Amino acid sequence: MFIDKLIESIKAKKSPVVVGLDPRIEKTPQFIKDVAFKRKGENIEGISEALYLFNKGIIDAVYDIVPAVKIQVAFYEAYGIEGFKAFFKTAEYAKSLGLMVIADVKRGDIQEVAKMYSKAYLQNQLFDAITVNPYMGEDTIMPYVEDAIKYNKGIFALVKTSNKGSKDIQDIKTTKGEYVYQSVARMINRISNSAIGKYGYSSIGAVVGATYPEEAKVLRKEMPNCFFLVPGYGAQGGTVEDIMDCFDENGFGAIINSSRSVIYAYQTPYWKDVYSEYEYAQAARAEVILMTGMINNGLVKRKYIAC
Amino acid sequence: MFIDKLIESIKAKKSPVVVGLDPRIEKTPQFIKDVAFKRKGENIEGISEALYLFNKGIIDAVYDIVPAVKIQVAFYEAYGIEGFKAFFKTAEYAKSLGLMVIADVKRGDIQEVAKMYSKAYLQNQLFDAITVNPYMGEDTIMPYVEDAIKYNKGIFALVKTSNKGSKDIQDIKTTKGEYVYQSVARMINRISNSAIGKYGYSSIGAVVGATYPEEAKVLRKEMPNCFFLVPGYGAQGGTVEDIMDCFDENGFGAIINSSRSVIYAYQTPYWKDVYSEYEYAQAARAEVILMTGMINNGLVKRKYIAC
């Protein structure tokens, strides 16, 4: 079952950190672009190759210390066919090193269409889980839930997202005296009952932004079944203290994604004097170790986990 | 400007009908599969070729009588790289015959990611417009709006969708005494002010399901700037009477999509004794002509347009 495997991997790696593979060609080290462009030409193929090679370096550097990677499909989809090739190759490489792979696709559509998205990602052995958008309602989520159960996969439904604009729709106050994201949360938590694993969590989880700690605290109580995929840590502004309430009292219940802060760690003030661009992958590893240490330290302070 | 071009095309073709290219391999005529499988093998490549050949037949049969086609990406995305090739080839072929192409992708994500989706579709000359999901808020829509203005493209944001489950989130009552979809509508209508064309409509439109005529009537008034892309007609249950309130008093304001009822018209009770599967494209043309006639007749009855 997806969620049991995820929890066991978090335990084994002693880390709830997920590395987000959101590569941008303009931030890719020149030496990687040189190799890729020489191999495939200075074109879409070369760009896609560079993104893949960049990812491969990151994966090699972190596969033994994180349970999963999250691949944001848009960074590949932007380059069409060649981009998708890099997306699939990245997933394949991550899986080959034992990582769980979350395809961050945020798809959502009517049932007949959702079935096709589910075929694309949940029925694809390269991916362990996907993110989905709940705006169109429960019937549009069910095809993913059915496939999650059938193929031992997971889904994370958007509940309260990390961006500023998440207030526009998600924070609308309803006549039930709650916010829209709480209504979504209740719907997802109810659906998640159908896929609960041996540790009490469901393979149907939720996306809850690191940037809204108060909301996360409420949601942790209102969605007891649901593991949280937490974006927004690091570059988007979320801190260790902000994410603590995403966890339960045993230190589970959340995986914390960081993309830019990890994969471009070598460009940050903290690491730029230590690592050159040639060492971008070591910098990413150092940042993951730092981030994991800080999060685990936060959990120890809360007495959620032992030292 | 996208919306002006769309309106002029509706006038020129005398039809607000959009054909949805949502091909399913299991419903594809055998003679097409035979050709495709012989050419590419009985595999993903062959399936994708069959979907493309099927679409090509439909496009050849309807390009002179409809302003646009809507291509639902999931039906291609399900087949990975090869599927995407068929998706792009379909768009290219439709454009080559002067059709406007709406990529029904329903993407939605934080700004940095939305920019990449916009690069994938709005910055791609194959597509004239895309559908987007507003759940994550205004800041996640703006990258599409900026590109729509810059590249003369359009967007249709989900407001009230055609499926039954659309009630779950979209119909939540808010403390303002309205429904969530009305809050979304207000947000989109406000955003749409930045892209109004010479006929008074904006290149920023809305998806409003044919299956909810009462809601559409309200939304037509609350979103005066916004053209509606109306799914749900035909196979999903929407009738001519259901969609009339999507139009304004001049007979504009909406394009009506039909997918299954058109592309598989030859299998419907109405046409199956007239057309064989070899004539699936003629059947699609006949259905489009019938549908256009019925809609235009409805508009005449309302005195929105002259005979």
From Swiss-Prot, chains A, B:
Domain of life: Bacteria
Pathway: Pyrimidine metabolism; UMP biosynthesis via de novo pathway; UMP from orotate: step 2/2
InterPro entries: Aldolase_TIM (IPR013785), OMPdecase_type-2 (IPR011995), OMPdeCOase_dom (IPR001754), RibuloseP-bd_barrel (IPR011060)
Single GO biological process annotation from the record: 'de novo' pyrimidine nucleobase biosynthetic process
Reaction(s) catalysed by this chain's protein: orotidine 5'-phosphate + H(+) = UMP + CO2
GO MF annotation terms: orotidine-5'-phosphate decarboxylase activity
Pfam families for the chain: OMPdecase
Active site: K106 (proton donor)
Keywords: Decarboxylase, Lyase, Pyrimidine biosynthesis
EC number per UniProt: 4.1.1.23
Family that this chain belongs to: Belongs to the OMP decarboxylase family. Type 2 subfamily.
HAMAP family linked to this entry: OMPdecase_type2
Protein name as it appears in the record: Orotidine 5'-phosphate decarboxylase
Organism name: Thermoanaerobacter sp. (strain X514)
